Amino acid sequence: MSSFGNNAGGGGREYHDDRSNRDHRHGNGGSDAGQRRREDHNSSYQSYRRPDGRQDSYGGGHQGNHGNSYGRREDDRSHSRDNHGGSRYGERDDRGNNGRSADNRYSQSNYNYDSNRGGQHYQRDNHGSKDDRGPMNQYNDHGSNHNSNSRNDQYRQGSYQGDGHSGYRRDDDRRRNDNDQARPYQSNRDSDRNSPRDHHNYNSQSSPRSHQGGQDRYSAPKEDNQRRYDNHQGGHDSYRGQNSGGYSGNNSGEYRNDYRSQQDSRDHRSGGNNSSSGFKNDGGFGGNDNRGFGNNGGGSFGNPNNSYRGNSNNIGGFHRSDGSNSEGVNAPVRAPRDWVPVTRDIDELVRETADRLADCDVGQDRAVEIRNAEKDVRLTSWTNSGLHPTILETLKRIKYNNVRTIQGAMIPQVLDGHDVLGQAETSAGKTAAFGLPIIDKILRMDEETRNKARQDDGPLALILAPTRELAAQIHEALRTYCQNTDIIVLLSYGQSDRARSLNEIRNGCDILIGTCGRIMDFTVKSHISLLHLRFLVFDEADRLLQDMKKDPLGHLGAIIKDAGFMESAATRQTIMTSATFNASVMTVANELMKRLPGQDEMIKIVLANGRLSKRVNLEFFECKGLAEKNAKLREILKQNVNGKTLKTIIFVQKKDQCDACAAKLTSGGMLAQTLHGDRSQDMREKLINDFKSNRVNLLVTTDLLSRGIDVSDLDRVINFDLPDGDPDQGADTFIHRAGRTGRTGRKENGLCVSFVDPQSDRDSLLAPKLVELIISQNLPDLKVPDFLDAMAKSSRGKSGTSGFGQRGGYGGRGGGFGGTGRGRGGGVFGGGGRGGDFGGSGNFGGSGGGGSFGGSGGGGGFGGVKPSGFGGSRNNAEPTSSGGGFGAPKAPTGFPSDNNDASEDAPAAGGFGFSTKAAQDAKKAEESATLGSSTFGTANNADEEPTETGADGNDDDEW
């Protein structure tokens, strides 16, 4: 086989070898170098008629196996760089080095480039056997098609100019200096056919990503090449979707994504247009519009992000650090470098806020307590709040008629200049609780103070949020409260235009809202000054610091070690708010927050009881395995109201599960979209706006949206997967997920539906916490399901007196595997008290609440009360305290005998250790007086390992 391309659109010639059935199209190399022979590697657009009469199309589509059509837009740009829908199922003709493969179902592509320049050809490893789902080596030297000098790293080939490739170039920010004005292929077929084939608009360094198979489609002016997606899902530039660029159902094949932003035009096509059940993906998934699963914003099945740079052994998807294989999930996608978040008109925000607050029932707010304060003062109305008159006028305009519970408790403390830790349930009004007093105090500042801050490019207030979505929501809320004032509120976070943000700050900024990564970057590079900072707010502080258990202060070092920040400590107020708190929050709080004279702790405003909003109803379904979950999900979603699908957020645990779940829904005719951290920020915001405006009613997401998205008319939340992590963390995440519904302004309660798998260790460990939440709701119609109650009892029996550790790892308050000592809380497997390594005084058991594997009795082996292994009896003496792991005080063998007596001193079964019933009751009573989670200074998981949510793909790290 051979094919010649006539450059620059000239009249190409056609050559045929002995296979007369093969018809070769002309290739347009884009240079004047004349003809180029492509031997052995089928790089031009080709079609040939097979002996069975079916026609195969290489490079631009395939009509063959299964009758699928993965067509390209035939604009006669017949060079092979425009890979619309390379065949996954297509017959491969890998000649020369590759040979012909009979089993071609999983071939990545047939587009094997032979450069003939510099002795290199760049070809996909098409030796793939049945399981070869992606290229082994993206760039191989000419002499070998296997594993020779693979360049699966950050270096990409440069321009495709004519019949060759330029030298390697770095795939980093230096690409922004290139003037890439690649033609975006927007013209129609007829006009394009009549136009000259001028491919000189591929400049000398055009698109470090496009030469591998797709034209550099999006190189809009000033756009970072990193966003220049040539992704037509042909599988040509690395592993773009497995079948023709996307997830394919039987005999369907069109995957298109033309989710567009204002800044760029994306038309990610792949495949034909005859799909019977394709996924409409205007940024996600769709129903029966025969459009695609193209997933422009990121995620699996046709992510427009080109290849997996810096990732070796890229076989069928990138391997994450946790060892799992994403099977086609692409790396995160960035927004264009000059992308700017949409700023909504203030009048629109006022109308929206007024509508939401009109039916607000403050009577459903949870009660809170004020601790460590000089006085317990609470607002009962805005008129006696002492807030600036301009603020009061604004509150009237937006119909904020009633003071919420958390606001009534927090605002007076902030106005008095105190540092405050504030806790409230979701949708309780925490943003106004810290925002209104900050605005009030800035309005009352003298002009000199404000001018100095502006001259030094420094904000007076800095508000940090864990996610960009939450930061954007806070920004809109504070803009609403600041209307008719001269206070400037700005927003800056990752993927938004950095230079523009800096220019805005330099023009004056009173309140700066952002995520940690962007703000720390500004601080380290001295782009902003923290010298004049008067207010520092950590909103959703537990989520903000949840991955920083080992050294939360170290991760914030760029801010808290800044010279200006340290100098402003005396005059700065620090405020932290969240529905829950953890040890990392307390570490930062103890370092940064001031206490009142005579107090050991800072002022805390805490929930008196219950942490879940009363506006949320709970439902639980037992689902054994993935198949039952999918069946139950379809059953629930088909229960429409008046023929309309209820607005629903579906939570899954990992990013790559989003697409699979949405695919199943879409194949059933339900329009679903996905949103997770691999989507570019512009797409994330576009999807959220579509969801809020009812253009989308089903949204499949990760815990990225468990906080910070306020959709007042959200009907339902479905926990397809229960949250991950230890039980306390899982319960906290569950509360935040459930809190997305039942928002302020809803006339009816929201609904949180959860699928619980009794075969899952994660679900079993979380079961006791879920039972606690159900009981804490204190709703007459809400009962604990029998299956969940059984799971909770079983879990408690396996994991100590309080199920996997309220204070100590793997155990009760006394620590691991059942111990009731208090003190430090022990290490993992450890009892209460300080203890020693593997016990303070005995083998594997410490006296006075030993360490690992230790109880708090006499310190026997593995925590028994006799100083011998496995906790034998001690002359049948009554136990004085709980036994440790593997030790029952009254069991001669060291293991428990059946004992149905419920005496106060009888040993009660615990996880590999036994505690007296009296001790358990005392512990239970003590815990009921706490906040329901490891909060506010109690010892909590001192040796708990970080969850690494950013690494394993479970969540989305905004650092």
From Swiss-Prot:
Gene3D superfamilies to which the protein is assigned, alphabetical: P-loop containing nucleotide triphosphate hydrolases (3.40.50.300)
Cellular component GO terms, alphabetical: cytoplasm; nucleus; P granule; P-body; perinuclear region of cytoplasm; RNAi effector complex
Family: Belongs to the DEAD box helicase family. DDX3/DED1 subfamily.
Polar residues composition bias: residue spans: 98-118, 137-160, 202-213, 930-941
Annotated ATP binding sites: 424-431
Any Pfam family matching the protein: DEAD
Compartment(s) where it occurs, according to its Swiss-Prot or TrEMBL record: Cytoplasm, Perinuclear region; Cytoplasmic granule; Cytoplasm; Cytoplasm, P-body
Catalytic activity: ATP + H2O = ADP + phosphate + H(+)
Comp. bias regions, Basic and acidic residues: 71-97, 122-134, 166-181, 189-201, 219-239, 255-270
Organism: Caenorhabditis elegans
Gene ablation phenotype (knockout): Viable with no obvious developmental defects. Insensitive to RNAi-mediated gene silencing. Increased sensitivity to viral infection.
Oligomer status and interactors: Interacts with wago-1, ergo-1 and rde-1.
Location of the region described as Disordered in the Swiss-Prot/TrEMBL record: 1-336, 793-834, 858-959
Cofactors (names): Mg(2+)
Signal peptide interval: none
Entry keyword annotation includes Nucleotide-binding: yes
Domain Helicase C-terminal: 632-792
Bias kind Low complexity: ranges: 271-280, 302-317
Protein name: DEAD-box ATP-dependent RNA helicase rde-12
Motif mapping: DEAD box: 539-542
Physiological role: Probable ATP-dependent RNA helicase involved in RNAi-mediated gene silencing. Specifically required in the endogenous siRNA pathway for biogenesis of secondary endogenous small interfering RNA (siRNA) intermediates called 22G-RNAs. May associate with and recruit rde-10 to primary siRNA-targeted mRNA for secondary siRNA synthesis. May be recruited to target mRNAs by rde-1 and/or ergo-1.
One function term, GO molecular function aspect: ATP binding
Record key words, sorted: ATP-binding, Cytoplasm, Helicase, Hydrolase, Nucleotide-binding, Repressor, RNA-mediated gene silencing, Translation regulation
